[in-house]
């Protein structure tokens, strides 16, 4: 029989040339481990942990077991502070970039980490943690466990070591593609990020779309900025946006940009969601945000008296790349956006929390909106009929 190091050579070749065809990273690890066990490696559990760039997630953990396949979990930043992580071999490997091995079948094995006792109780006889070195110097890690009596043989350890470098290359390519998606989603939004990642990056690349438009603003922000310490102001702004963004996303909207204390979002209209459905969803998101902000204003000392204004409109917008040279913005423009901006200012003058255009109400139906009157709007020749919520009057919030 061929030694394991020779048997896994075909697996290494697949990892280098064939793994890229798998659509999901967990599928790569599953097939890798299945190929290795078929080649004779006595694997009981394999783990790969790769750090990422994400505002809420420190990294992704892939755990393969022959009975469950590969299970993926996202690790929050709190993971780095947990004692179970701090007291693990992973920290040693991440800090030193060196492999770690404990042959747990050996009665004299050094049990210098709590996890080793847990592994031995599970019947693990050998445990290897190998660093995955990325080209930028970052160190991630993989772990390999067996229940084979006596642990891994020297040839099996050699076979595992031969996999580490190609596994690191595959993991890095997939990790950076995911990082690119994470960063684009974080800073330009999911739909816009997917468009950019798909290659829509030339200046002037735009698409005309139908959308409900959301433009909101914090009332009295200048006064708050003048009275609050800078960090308290930032914290308040974040909590203020926390009241809006989840509601927008849950109702099918896409946040395009933050403008100081302002927020621009769209609710795209397509074959699956028509005008009336989208406008009703945008209005419900507005109500949810209003209620959340009212609760924040009542409970937060710094947010006492916090006020919110929102304009809702519907129309055609140009969605795409606008800017200069190699500094572009993926946003939306057009007369419909301009009108939404004017209505948002009008809402402040009228003491209204939510103001909607006539076009929006035509598509939304009543929805609890009532006419307020016609008003002159800068930049538009005709006066605009505007609507407000029936359940609030002037200075409702």
What are these regions (language model features)?
Residues 48-79:
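GAF sensory/regulatory domain recognition
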Residues 67-125:
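Regulatory sensory and allosteric helical modules in signal-transduction proteins
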Residues 125-133:
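Short hydrophobic beta-strand micro-motif common in sensory/regulatory domains
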Residues 145-161, 332:
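Regulatory loop-to-helix N-cap segments in sensory/regulatory domains
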Residues 156-208:
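Regulatory cytosolic signal-relay segments
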Residues 200-284:
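Catalytic NTP-binding/metal-coordinating core of nucleotidyl cyclase/transferase enzymes
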Residues 238-252, 269, 273-310, 335-344:
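Alpha-helical scaffold within the catalytic cores of cyclic-nucleotide enzymes
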Residues 317, 340, 346-397:
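Cytosolic regulatory/linker segments at or just downstream of nucleotide-handling modules
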